[in-house]
Amino acid sequence: MAFTLEDIVQRFGGEVVGNGSQRVGSLAPLDQAGPDQLAFLANPKYLSQVETTRAGAVLINAEDLARLASRESRNFIVTPNPYAYFARVAQTFIDLAAPKAVPGVHPSATIDPSAQIAASAVIGPHVTVEAGAVIGENVRLDANVVIGRGTRIGADSHLYPNVAVYYGCKLGERVIVHAGAVIGSDGFGFAPDFVGEGDARTGSWVKIPQVGGVSIAADVEIGANTTIDRGAMADTIIEECVKIDNLVQIGHNCKVGAYTVIAGCAGIAGSTTIGRHCMIGGAVGIAGHVTLADYVIVTAKSGVSKSLLKPGMYTSAFPAVNHADWNKSAALLRNIDKLRDRIKALENAAAGRQDGPAANAASSSAGDKA
């Protein structure tokens, strides 16, 4: 299905510059788009591509439009945030093109008689819904999803294949959980019960029952193979509109504030609180029992071992450098204690010279005057 630029502006706002009757039916990058496609400019360093693109129209902000050398024979939709505008238009195109799922329960699904399934829900092959679970309106559970006893899934949510949501968890409306994610598995809680030292040490680790749940608010998206552990006593909490990438681990009793984004392979240890509107980069490690303020940014591969109580950007990762340069830096790092001692010795020697003959002469002169 194709839309005119005027149709798009009526739905999403913005201003058409050029031919409002131009029709577009899909989206593409600036350097690949054709005459029936819509492209966007989110980064001004690609401005030159706007002047050579074959796109039927380009989403652009007013500042970048003013910088163009020529607008001749080109069509634009002017909007303050072309990237977000692109995302909304793309979602509309995808929704219209996607086949409509038919409500109902697949014959191979296993549904406990006490579970409540909305008539508009789509329950796929080999899904399991345990006792007391509640599945809301327009929920879609794809193949092999498992919903534990007493768990509630809010309206318009979509759980992709092989998602497991353990017992007693709550997912709000419009939650998306991608394939293989696990919500509500046991938190990593073990009490040490050892006596003795060395080879004479005896005892074991005692598992601490994890009797809390996981509470996920509306409009959260969770990536493939991510795990969110249930709380030890209270719930692990994910607030509204949090976006979590693939392969993220969130430990028990964590709280992730609204509108925070967490990139892939990050690991967040238990009882950590992350504020609102934070950005956690890929492969970041956050220790347990720490707090991050609102609007904190932690760059990729950083390690956070203590609370970050002021907004801002934090980095502890070492950026990649030429291998030979890294070896030189590593050699210096190994000898840093020796270098420190040499500097301290030089400082002491310099201080001794200052306290030496000149200082003694001044003292003697003062004594003579007395």
UniProtKB/Swiss-Prot annotation:
Its EC number is 2.3.1.191. The keyword Lipid metabolism applies. Keywords: Acyltransferase, Lipid A biosynthesis, Lipid biosynthesis, Lipid metabolism, Repeat, Transferase. GO terms for cellular component: membrane. It is an enzyme of class 2 (transferase). CDD domains: LbH_LpxD (cd03352). Residues 350-370 are annotated as: Disordered. It catalyses: a UDP-3-O-[(3R)-3-hydroxyacyl]-alpha-D-glucosamine + a (3R)-hydroxyacyl-[ACP] = a UDP-2-N,3-O-bis[(3R)-3-hydroxyacyl]-alpha-D-glucosamine + holo-[ACP] + H(+). Catalyzes the N-acylation of UDP-3-O-acylglucosamine using 3-hydroxyacyl-ACP as the acyl donor. Is involved in the biosynthesis of lipid A, a phosphorylated glycolipid that anchors the lipopolysaccharide to the outer membrane of the cell. This is UDP-3-O-acylglucosamine N-acyltransferase.
